[in-house]
C-alpha cells in the first residue's frame, strides 16, 4: 500500500530506541523527512545515521521533551530545516511502577507532566503549522492501559487515560474546525523494548510484539489513506486486553 506520505515532514519524539525507533524506521521507509528528538545523544546519533544511510533527510535535537519549551523548539526546528511540519509522533517513556495508594503528589504530577502534558504541548505547537496547509497527522504513543488498567502501573494508567480523554476531545475540535488534521492514539501492549526489560518482563519475550511492526501501525495512522481515522485509540497488544 502506498501511504502517500513521501517527502512529508515528520517529528518523532523519543525516536532513538524502542517503539519510537520503530516508528522512525517505518516512516523513513516511506520516504518521510524526519526530525528526531531524544535525551540520549549517542542513541539519537545512531538512529539518525541509520536513516541517513537509507537516503532520508534528518534533523536532530538532544532535548528533554518534558521541559515546557521543548515542543515549540522542535516544531521551530522542523520549519527552519524543512519548511513545514506534516506529521507528529508524540512518544515519551513511561513512569516508574507503583501501587496507587503508595504514590505521593509529586510522583503523580511528574507522570502527568511526562505522559500527558508533554503530548498536549506538542499538539498545541504543531497544529498551527499543519493547519496552514490543511493537512496533518498526529499520533500519540500511549499504552493499552487506556482500555484496561495494568496492575502496579498506577502512574501510567492515570496519565495515559488523561491523555486519551484530552486527545479524543481535541480530535473532535480539529474535525469541527475543518483543519484536515487527524489526532489518534497508538496503544501498545507488551513489546520487546528496554522498557519491558526494566519492568522485569523478560520471561514474556516469546509473546511480545515487535517494535518494527508497531512502527508500521503508527505509519499507517500518519498516512494519507488514514484520513477518516480520527479520535481513535488503536490497541496493538496481540489480544492481551479483555476489554471490549
Feature roles, as predicted:
Residues 2, 148, 219, 230-244:
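Short C-terminal tail/terminal secondary-structure segment
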Residues 9, 16-18:
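Conserved glycine-rich cofactor-binding loop
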Residues 89, 175-182, 229-231:
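Short, small/polar-rich loop/turn modules that mediate ligand/substrate recognition or access, typified
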Residues 99-100, 104-112, 138, 196:
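Substrate-binding pocket helix/loop in short-chain dehydrogenase/reductase
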Residues 128, 172-176, 227:
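Alpha-helical segment proximal to the catalytic Tyr-Lys
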Residues 137-162, 167-176, 190-191:
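Catalytic loop of short-chain dehydrogenase/reductase
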Residues 203-214, 225:
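A conserved structural motif in NAD(P)-dependent oxidoreductases
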Amino acid at each position: 500500500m502506498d501511504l502517500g506520505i513521501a517527502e512529508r515532514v515528520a517529528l518523532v519524539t523519543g525516536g532513538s530506541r524502542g517503539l519510537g525507533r520503530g516508528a522512525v524506521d517505518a516512516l523513513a521507509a516511506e520516504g518521510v523527512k524526519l526530525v528526531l528528538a531524544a535525551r540520549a545523544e549517542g542513541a539519537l546519533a545512531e538512529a539518525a545515521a541509520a536513516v541517513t544511510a537509507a537516503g532520508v533527510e534528518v534533523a536532530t535535537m538532544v532535548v528533554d521533551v518534558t521541559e515546557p519549551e521543548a515542543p515549540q523548539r522542535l516544531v521551530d526546528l522542523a520549519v527552519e530545516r524543512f519548511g513545514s511540519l506534516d506529521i507528529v509522533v508524540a512518544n515519551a517513556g513511561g513512569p516508574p511502577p507503583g501501587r496507587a495508594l503508595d504514590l505521593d503528589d509529586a510522583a503523580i504530577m511528574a507522570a502527568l507532566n511526562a505522559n500527558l502534558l508533554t503530548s498536549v504541548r506538542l499538539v498545541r505547537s504543531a497544529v498551527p503549522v499543519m493547519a496552514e496547509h490543511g493537512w496533518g497527522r498526529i499520533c500519540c504513543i500511549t499504552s493499552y492501559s487506556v482500555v484496561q488498567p495494568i496492575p502496579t502501573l498506577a502512574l501510567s494508567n492515570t496519565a495515559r487515560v488523561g491523555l486519551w480523554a484530552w486527545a479524543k476531545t481535541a480530535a473532535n475540535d480539529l474535525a469541527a474546525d475543518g483543519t484536515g488534521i487527524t489526532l489518534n492514539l497508538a496503544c501498545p501492549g507488551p513489546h520487546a523494548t528496554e522498557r519491558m526489560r526494566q519492568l522485569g518482563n523478560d520471561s514474556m519475550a516469546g509473546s511480545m510484539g515487535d517494535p518494527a511492526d508497531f512502527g508500521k501501525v503508527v505509519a499507517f495512522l500518519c498516512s494519507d489513506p488514514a484520513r477518516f481515522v480520527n479520535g481513535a485509540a488503536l490497541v496493538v497488544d496481540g489480544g492481551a486486553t479483555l476489554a471490549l
